[in-house]
Amino acid sequence: ASDVYKRQLSPSSILMSSGHTTVSNMFYNMASHRVGLVGNWDCVAFDEVGGITNTSGDMIQIMKNYMANGSFARGSDSISSDASIAFEGNTFRSVADMLRTTNLFEPFPEGFNNDSAFFDRIHAYLPGWETPKLRASLFTNKYGLISDCFSEFCHAMRKYDFTNSFGEYF
């Protein structure tokens, strides 16, 4: 189901199914002077966060800076981007056990899990156990919104800033 990002919902997203990438691939390759995935996609999604293998200090630090500011520095270059980063994964315990614990981010690799500043920069946590599983009764035989139309709408709306739109509600 997590391949929805790339194959079914949005051609503007990429799914890193292996969980492995490098700083050069993700952000900026200093040898070729080319911006990485965050400069070329609306959303870079990591499938199975527990499988993320690059937990180097550089990767975590650059990712934290990017998540906080929408920019990162590589060498003497400072690059801005507005790509979202999504982390997907399964829990290793039952829902009841997860609800009793205070660390819902346990599936992340140790390099991330020991960095509270990384988790401070996460904007949303969607507990998958609260999302209904897809089944025939959820589909309609009436008119509906085709996913590529919705995807294009979301892609076009990225140029608008709604950051302050929610202030009156919080």
Stretch-by-stretch model annotation:
Residues 8-45, 51-56:
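AAA+/P-loop NTPase substrate/partner-engagement loops
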Residues 28-35, 68-83, 106-115:
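Conserved Walker
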Residues 40-43, 80-86:
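Loop/turn-to-beta-strand initiation segments
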Residues 40-66, 92-101, 117-118:
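Conserved AAA+/SF3 P-loop NTPase catalytic/coupling segment centered on the Walker-B
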Residues 50-52, 85-95, 105, 129-134:
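Conserved nucleotide-binding/hydrolysis micro-motifs of P-loop NTPases
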Residues 99-132:
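A short helix-turn-beta junction within AAA+ P-loop NTPase domains corresponding to the substrate/partner-engaging
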Residues 123-170:
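Conserved AAA+ ATPase small/helical "lid" subdomain
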